[in-house]
Curated annotation (Swiss-Prot):
Gene3D superfamilies assigned: 2.40.50.580, 3.40.1350.60
Family per similarity comment: Belongs to the SfsA family.
Domain of life: Bacteria
Pfam families with a match to the protein in the record: SfsA (PF03749), SfsA_N (PF17746)
GO molecular function list: DNA binding
This protein's name: Sugar fermentation stimulation protein homolog
Organism the protein comes from: Pelobacter propionicus (strain DSM 2379 / NBRC 103807 / OttBd1)
HAMAP family the UniProt entry points to: SfsA (MF_00095)
Amino acid sequence: MRLPPLIAGTLVRRYKRFLADVILEDGSPVTVHCPNSGSMKGCASPGSRVLLSRSANPGRAYPLTWELVESDGCWAGINTSLPNRLVREAIENGTVVELRGYDSIRPEVAYGQRSRIDLLLEGPAGRCYVEVKNVTLVEGERALFPDAVTVRGQKHLNELMRVVREGDRGVIFFTVQRGDAESVSPADAIDPEYGRLLRLALDSGVEALAYRAVVSPEEIRLKERLPVIL
């Protein structure tokens, strides 16, 4: 996925979940939209280099959106609206070999208990429900999810277990939007219930896929699979 021209700045603070104050390279202070509702642990330190996109909509209250942050010497993608598109692109171009062979991909399809699946794949082999997660927290060389307690994420695991019981395929897809991770694990110290449900889901037939992205100011694309270590 190609990115638009990005604007560089320095993070002052992130607050109210969806706002951040940034100093641009010319010294101008701006308030920008933060498209991430998680804790952003490790990715929201004051003084970090950030890259912003500019909206073409003149009516937006905050025309700049925070896209990337430099964390531990590498760029990390914090925009949680991108992973679904990244995964779909990678499925369509054949990068995700485990999800080849489906004829159609539909986003945001209603299912379960008032839920929407990120991607529904359909083909001769049946249906595959893919729930996509954005991963930016890294400790050592291990990416961890979630970075905050996620009741919604717990619900998604229960929904995937249900579709597997009904005979369909269910996949939890961890999109690691940074290049310094070598594996993915549940963040048990942050959300032990999510870790418990993830292990239960995998024992129940849900599949876990994790792919690391190449992240640069010019593009973000999924490149290679990482092991999921429980």
